[in-house]
Amino acid sequence: MSISIEQAIIHEISQDSQGQMRCRLRPQPLLNTHAVETMLEELHQTYSGKAGKGFGFFGTHGDDGEANSEFSDALTGYRKGDLGFVEFSGQASQLLQQELAKYDFSQGGFLLMSCYTSMTSDYLFVALLSAKSSMTVLDDMELSQNNHLDLNNIQLAARIDLTEWQADKSSRKYISFIRGRAGRKVADFFLDFMGCVEGVNTKAQNKTLIHAVEDFVAGSELTKDERQDCRNKVFEYCSERADAGEVIEVKDLADELADSGMDSFYDFACGGSYELDEEFPADKASLRSLKKFSGTGGGVTLSFDGGHLGERVIYDPISDTILIKGVPANLKDQLDRRLKGE
């Protein structure tokens, strides 16, 4: 296993017959059975591989509408040993119940909380899981309907890097969370119950890095191939960091480029007007523009490797046209068939 489980528990939050949200609390942690270990390992892998996560931190409580600190206070109590895990998770469930009660659309679910270690960091994983209906075939070949936890479609989940939180209280990225298909608004109530405030605009930082890289190669004496090699090295470094669950460190990236003969990127990126943080999470979707050009509009979708620009793909901004040399075989076949009237 890639994780070492310390504690895990599940509580249920659901609507009663009067439509009120109620908690059904489990009185003891889950046993570390094979089923529990398999579930948490799967969730860890699924969550770590989710693209486009947001990052934040615990806000402060105040009279001006700032974040509620009850969750972080309870977590602090647990980490100090003042609260047991069951008591802490029960308080968290009550907080989530109170938050869900504010919304008409709330259906509740199963609140899973787990403390575990991965690599050198301790984490608290928090997810609101839903049950999904499925069919199974019994021994007598009759069909039976049952419910199971939908682990492949988690939309309301967050992970707190406890190690970073305790080591650097000024950090603004020790909480990661899934934004959901419709953006952050879907997860507002889930973040609010934890008192989480978004701290790092991951997409903006990644796009700023790309902007800095493009300006850097444009102002250099590198050849066309060397410029693309620089972009590829940046993409590879950032992708490796994303896959490992690590942040992009601009100084570390600059050292990687310097090893390939591309010096001074750190001074260029951090000494200019880019407002680039020293470190920030990677967003692979944004970084793909270092290797590919792509766009969609007016019924046309086009995508090609950046190295083809100026060779197989010629762009003329004056006439607003793109010339493609060497049409892909499968596309050429479709076009030829259409021209022949087939």
Swiss-Prot record:
Coiled-coil segments: none
PANTHER family xrefs: NUCLEOID-ASSOCIATED PROTEIN YEJK (PTHR38772:SF1), PTHR38772
Subcellular compartments: Cytoplasm, Nucleoid
Species of the source: Shewanella frigidimarina (strain NCIMB 400)
InterPro entries with a match to the protein in the record: Nucleoid_associated_NdpA
GO cellular component, one term: cytoplasm
Keywords: Cytoplasm
GO molecular function: double-stranded DNA binding; single-stranded RNA binding
Family affiliation: Belongs to the YejK family.
Name of the protein this chain belongs to: Nucleoid-associated protein Sfri_2491
